[in-house]
Amino acid sequence: MSSCCGGKCGCGSVCSCGSGCNGCGMAPDLSYMEGSTTETLVMGVAPQKSHMEASEMGVAAENGCKCGDNCTCNPCNCK
């Protein structure tokens, strides 16, 4: 997969991969907020889902925002 940041596209105001690399956000530049945030991964046993959620996909596509070549958004209309 040739998308940026291990498959996570960070679409900011300049439509490029940012330092956060948290995926395409629903609000502008929220994925680039700096601070002392902590991410917790909880693993357990649950029934298998029969569908894939967009937040779990390697290449996100929200509001027309998806990773293109060379760490850019294609098309560049992230909202």
UniProtKB/Swiss-Prot annotation:
Molecular functions (GO terms): metal ion binding
Alphabetical UniProt keywords: Metal-binding, Metal-thiolate cluster
Pfam families: Metallothio_2
Top-rank taxon, per record: Eukaryota
Cited InterPro entries: Metalthion_15p (IPR000347)
UniProt function note: Metallothioneins have a high content of cysteine residues that bind various heavy metals.
Family per record: Belongs to the metallothionein superfamily. Type 15 family.
Official protein name in the record: Metallothionein-like protein type 2
Organism of origin: Malus domestica
Gene of this entry: MT1
